[in-house]
């Protein structure tokens, strides 16, 4: 057996030490590369690639950067709120003083329909840094989810006080006022939205609802038609102005005119039971019975506890001489109406 000399052994040790010293630098360089690529992907709007790259950067050097926060931001853009929540909880555990992570986590919990938890996180975040108008907007919307409109209005008012040009905060404040039948305040809020954006279809549609509640049908119809025209060409059209226009035409006994906007409402809001109910009712009134049955049955599948849907189904089955089904639906209507009456304070 041959033994290395002392010089040989010291040389090997020196080489090993150099390699050990190089490993952290190589890891750091690799982490920096993945992080930088993630930032580039994020800024270019490639959020799927960004989320993957930030995850790799975090795996290489756990807890040393804000890669988890950027990964969460990427996942929010991808509407993957559950994964975003996981990333933010990990980061907040390692960095409990990060107001950025907490505010984003509060938003994510709101989007997951967890308002109580969202409010708890916003309270923690506010202890670290004062909230922005957008933050207070989400706090207000958490209270909307909790059906607490008094507190919703309180925080939405604070949001627009802090950020008077926050169009979305003004819009949601208008909606909260409308839910409390504070029509004057609601109108002012929606008019403020239109002052900030003169072709905001949501605000114009809601002005139509106010006009309709004030028994001004012609002005309401005009507002709904404006909202439809203003959102035309948008990649994210809402079914609401079509639904509101068609519903008002039905109330005015103009069922033939109501069919077209209600068909468009169904096209845009295929999972909205009200759209199927209203177009089914329009078909029933224009004697298009098979189509009425189809739409009303779809509405019932989407919202089986809605008494109005069961009542219209009973009418269509009776008209089509399906008497057993008609009796069942009339009975179901009475049951749901009795239950609703019994639950009122």
Summary of predicted features, one role per range:
Residues 31-32, 65-66, 99-100, 132-134, ...:
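Helix-start (N-cap) detector for alpha-helical repeat units in TPR-like alpha-solenoids
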Residues 32-56, 60, 77, 107, ...:
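Alpha-helical segment of the N-proximal tetratricopeptide repeat
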Residues 44-52, 78-90, 111-124, 145-158, ...:
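Structural signature of tandem alpha-helical TPR/SEL1-like repeats
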Residues 60, 94, 128, 162, ...:
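Structural marker of alpha-solenoid helical repeat scaffolds
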Residues 301, 307-341:
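TPR/TPR-like (Sel1-like) alpha-helical repeat modules
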